[in-house]
A protein has these predicted regions:
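Cleavable N-terminal signal peptides of Sec/SRP-targeted secreted and luminal proteins
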Residues: 3-17
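Proteolytic processing junctions in secreted/extracellular precursors
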Residues: 18-19, 431
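Well-ordered mid-protein domain cores that form the structural environment of catalytic cofactors
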Residues: 33, 81, 85-158
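Long, positively charged leader/targeting segments at protein N-termini
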Residues: 20-72, 76-81, 127, 136-422
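N-terminal leader/targeting segments
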Residues: 1-3, 62
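Short acidic, low-complexity intrinsically disordered linear motifs used
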Residues: 426-430
C-alpha cells in the first residue's frame, strides 16, 4: 500500500516537473520566427491576464535581453503595416472626403466601406436615435457589404493564438470588447423594428469602428512579447529601442538586475490609449527639442499610426470634446514647430504653445476624479493600480513641464544675446 502511495506522490512530482508551462508554446513559436530572447530571461505565469518576466541569473546593465521582429504580431492582417505613413496617406484622403473620425482604427479598402463604417459608428454612438437617423435605411446593407472572413478581424483569435497570448493585454481587451459588442447588439435589437443582424455578425462589423481594435496600443500588445509597453512604468528595469530599418524592437536592461528579480510585469487592465491625448502631439523632431523633452516610445509610434494634417478636419459628434480640442491644439503646435527655422532662436512661440498644451493636458488630470476612473475602468480588476499609474503620470508631466520651461528660458537668453550682438553691429555700421 505504501508503495502505491509513494508511487502516486512521485508521479505527481514528475508530471509537475515535466508538464508544459503556458509559455512553452509561446517561446517555441517565437524562436521559430527569429525572436532572440536571452537565456537569462524567464517568464512567470500569473493568470490568463497577467505574466511577468524575471532574471534567471544576474544580468549586467545595458544587456540586450530581447530582439523582437515586428512579424511576430498575431494580428492576422499584419497590423504593423499601420506604422507605414505611406500606406496611410491614401486612406487618409478618403477619410477627409468623408469627414471621417480619426478616432476610428479601421482603414477601409474602399470609399463604400468607409461610408458604411461611418454609418455603423454613427448609429451605435446614438442608439436612442436609431430609428430617427437618416442612416437607418442603410444599416441592413452592412451585412452584405463587409467581408465576412474572420481573418480580417484581429479581435477574433484562433484557439492556438489565444494560447500564445495568455497573460497579455490583447487577450483581456478582446474579451471585454466582445462583451461590449454583445451588449450593444442586444440594445439595438430592442429598439429596432426588425432584426437586421445577429450578434456574431454585429461583433465583426463593430470591430471595424472602434479605436480599441486597431490602435497602436493594441497592435503592440498583440505581439505576445511586447506587453512591456503596458507594464507599470513606476519600476522600469528595461528600455526599448525601435529599429525602424530592420523593423525590430530591442529590449535592454537599464541597470544591473539580480537573479530572481522581476524585470517587468504585465498587470491589470490599464491601456496607454490616454497617452496619445497627453503626449502624442506631432512635432518637428529637432535635436534640441528631443533633448529637452523626450516623449515616450508609445507616443512616437502613435505619431506614425495617426496622421493629423488638415486644419479643416471635422470631427464626428461622438468624439470626446476634450480629445477634439486637444487634437486641434496639437495640430496648431505642429504647424508652428514646422516653421521653427530662425537661427537666432527668436521664434520660440512654438515651444511656448507646446508648453501651454502640455499644461492644459496636466489640468485634465487634476479634473479627473476617482469616480471618473471607476466609470472609465469599471471592469478593471485593480482600480488602485490605475490610480497609481495616473499619479505617476502627473508627476512625470510636472517634471517635463519644468524641463520645457527651462529650455524656453535658455532659448530666450540665447536669442537675446544674438539680438544684442546684432543691434551693436547695426549701431557700429551706422557710425
Amino acid at each position: 500500500m505504501k508503495f502505491f502511495f509513494y508511487y502516486f506522490i512521485l508521479s505527481i512530482f514528475i508530471s509537475l516537473y515535466t508538464s508544459k508551462t503556458p509559455y512553452d508554446d509561446l517561446l517555441s513559436w517565437g524562436k521559430d520566427n527569429s525572436l532572440f530572447i536571452s537565456d537569462k530571461l524567464g517568464m512567470r505565469y500569473i493568470n490568463e491576464n497577467n505574466k511577468s518576466y524575471y532574471a534567471l541569473d544576474d544580468i549586467p546593465e545595458n544587456t540586450l535581453i530581447m530582439d523582437i521582429p515586428y512579424d511576430l504580431m498575431l494580428n492576422r492582417v499584419k497590423a504593423f503595416k499601420l506604422l507605414d505613413n505611406k500606406k496611410l496617406e491614401k486612406t487618409y484622403e478618403e477619410f477627409k472626403k468623408l469627414k471621417f473620425s480619426i478616432d476610428v482604427g479601421f482603414l477601409p479598402a474602399s470609399l463604400e466601406q468607409a461610408f458604411l463604417a461611418y454609418i455603423l459608428l454613427y448609429v451605435t454612438s446614438k442608439p436612442k436615435y436609431y430609428k430617427k437617423t437618416k442612416f437607418y435605411e442603410y444599416f441592413h446593407y452592412l451585412i452584405d457589404t463587409f467581408e465576412t472572413d474572420l481573418d480580417s478581424f484581429p479581435v477574433f483569435f484562433t484557439p492556438s493564438q489565444t494560447q500564445l497570448l495568455q497573460g497579455s493585454l490583447a487577450l483581456i481587451d478582446t474579451t471585454l470588447l466582445k462583451e461590449l459588442y454583445k451588449e450593444e447588439a442586444n440594445n439595438l435589437e430592442k429598439i429596432s423594428n426588425k432584426k437586421s443582424f445577429d450578434v456574431d455578425e454585429y461583433m465583426r462589423y463593430r470591430t471595424l469602428t472602434t479605436i480599441k481594435t486597431l490602435n497602436i496600443t493594441n497592435i503592440t500588445s498583440i505581439v505576445p512579447f511586447i506587453d512591456m509597453f503596458e507594464n507599470d512604468p513606476i519600476d522600469y528595469n528595461v528600455n526599448f529601442k525601435l529599429n525602424e530599418t530592420n523593423k525590430n524592437i530591442f529590449v535592454f536592461t537599464t541597470h544591473p538586475i539580480r537573479r530572481g528579480s522581476t524585470l517587468y510585469i504585465r498587470s491589470g487592465h490599464f491601456s496607454n490609449n490616454k497617452r496619445f491625448v497627453i503626449y502624442g502631439q506631432t512635432f518637428e523632431k529637432t535635436k534640441d527639442y528631443i533633448e529637452a523633452f523626450q516623449i515616450p516610445m508609445i507616443s512616437l509610434m502613435l505619431q506614425k499610426s495617426i496622421k493629423v494634417d488638415d486644419e479643416n478636419f471635422e470631427y464626428d459628434e461622438s468624439i470626446d470634446l476634450v480629445k477634439k480640442k486637444f487634437y486641434k491644439n496639437a495640430l496648431k503646435t505642429y504647424k508652428k514647430l514646422s516653421k521653427y527655422n530662425k537661427e537666432d532662436g527668436s521664434d520660440i512661440s512654438a515651444y511656448k504653445l507646446f508648453l501651454k498644451n502640455l499644461q492644459m493636458s496636466r489640468e485634465i488630470y487634476d479634473k479627473t476624479t476617482t469616480s471618473d476612473i471607476h466609470r472609465e475602468f469599471v471592469k478593471a480588476k485593480d482600480i488602485n493600480n490605475v490610480i497609481r499609474v495616473l499619479t505617476f503620470e502627473k508627476n512625470y508631466m510636472d517634471e517635463k513641464i519644468g524641463v520645457l520651461k527651462k529650455f524656453i528660458e535658455k532659448l530666450e537668453k540665447e536669442g537675446n544675446k544674438i539680438k544684442d550682438k546684432k543691434s551693436k553691429e547695426n549701431k557700429n555700421q551706422d557710425l
